[in-house]
Design a protein with these regions (language model features):
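Glycine- and acidic-residue-biased ligand/ion/polar-headgroup-sensing regions
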Residues: 61-80
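Short acidic-glycine-tyrosine-enriched beta hairpin
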Residues: 81-98
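Ligand-binding loop in jelly-roll beta-barrel domains
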Residues: 71, 98-119
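A short glycine-rich, His/Asp/Glu-containing loop-to-beta-strand
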Residues: 27-57, 63-66, 116
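Bacterial Sec-dependent N-terminal signal peptides
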Residues: 1-18
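Short beta-strand segments in beta-sandwich/barrel cores
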Residues: 55-56, 72-76, 92
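N-terminal low-complexity, Pro/Thr/Ser-rich intrinsically disordered segments
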Residues: 18-30
Length: 120
């Protein structure tokens, strides 16, 4: 019986993520925080800007590389909980995928990131 239930629920795995916006679609209180710099058949590159008190509402990320043009202090909430992090200028990161998170710039400076999403 458990096997049958597991098979019936399998198509719903990941359903919530598909309902979430991607980084370009997500914004903050109805306003965009990311803009497309480059998009072609191989890659999409976004610049995301977060003045103090501005965040990025709950969204998912496909595989991506990020680079911090201007650092800042953020409150990040994801499946692991909520934490505050200082992201320095020049910080580079890679994620295979981020099922969901939301962020808020709690610092006093505007932070700017490049997000590069390869299209496989």
């Amino acid at each position: 019986m458990r096997s049958l239930l597991a098979l019936m629920l399998l198509p719903l795995a990941g359903f919530g993520q598909q309902e979430l916006p991607d980084p370009l679609q997500a914004g903050w209180k109805g306003k965009k925080v990311c803009e497309v710099l480059v998009e072609n058949e191989s890659v999409r590159t976004l610049r995301c800007t977060f003045p103090p008190g501005i965040g990025h509402e709950k969204h998912y990320h496909p595989k991506h590389v990020g680079y911090t043009l201007k650092g800042g202090t953020f409150r990040i909430t994801d499946a692991k909980g909520t934490r505050e992090v200082n992201i320095p200028e020049g910080y580079t990161f890679y994620n295979e995928e981020v099922p969901w998170h939301e962020v808020l710039n709690i610092g006093s400076d505007t932070a700017v990131f490049l997000i590069v999403e390869p299209k496989d």
